[in-house]
Amino acid sequence: MTNLILIFAAQILLFYAVASVGDELGRTMNGKHLGPYKKEKLTHLRVYWHNSVNGRNPSSVMIQQPVLNSSLSGSITMMDDPLTFDVPRNATVVGQAQGMYVAAAQGEIGFLMVMNFAFTTGKYNGSTITILGRNVVMSKVREMPVVGGSGIFRFARGYVEARTKSFDLKAGC
């Protein structure tokens, strides 16, 4: 009987210890601790990311070949593409589009895009925008969700609209 009482008392103490730890892990945050991020701002950016898959200095490299030779499906490509605020490839670079794209469609050219727009100049220097979504390359407009960010874009949410401005199959860009 004494052992039963000790076990019961130990269970009660353990329950209270776990319950009090649980309260500390999931507490509501006071808005004053968010600093400059407590107010939402709307920012509209127009950037151009220049993807090059071949040539002397490709910005994207396939690291996993397709599973089947009949489609790109299953291939994985890592990218570190220059970002600019203007169309020409020789425009001033303001950051990098870094991440990967995975060929995830069998009947079309469709990719799962996982990337950060990492800005390296101006007021956005050191900030990133994180994008995760589906990119069907042959569609005129592709929409992908913004799932977060860092720096000035902390707590970012929204969407990206991708449009192909130019495509040169021979040059690979």
From Swiss-Prot:
The residue range of the signal peptide is 1-22
Which compartments does it reside in?
A: Secreted, Extracellular space, Apoplast
Name the InterPro entries for this protein. Answer: Allene_oxi_cyc_Dirigent (IPR044859), Dirigent (IPR004265)
First-listed, main subcellular location of the protein, grouped into a coarse class = secreted
Record has Signal as a keyword: yes
The GO annotation for biological process reads:
phenylpropanoid biosynthetic process
Carbohydrate-modified residues are 69, 90, 125
User: Would you name any one GO CC term?
Assistant: apoplast
The entry's keywords: Apoplast, Glycoprotein, Secreted, Signal
Pfam families per the UniProt record, alphabetical = Dirigent
Q: How does it assemble?
A: Homodimer.
Its annotated function is as follows: Dirigent proteins impart stereoselectivity on the phenoxy radical-coupling reaction, yielding optically active lignans from two molecules of coniferyl alcohol in the biosynthesis of lignans, flavonolignans, and alkaloids and thus plays a central role in plant secondary metabolism.
Q: Which family does it belong to?
A: Belongs to the plant dirigent protein family.
Q: What is this protein called?
A: Dirigent protein 8
Task: State the species of origin.
Answer: Arabidopsis thaliana (Mouse-ear cress)
Lineage of the organism: Eukaryota, Viridiplantae, Streptophyta, Embryophyta, Tracheophyta
Give me the gene this protein comes from. Answer: DIR8
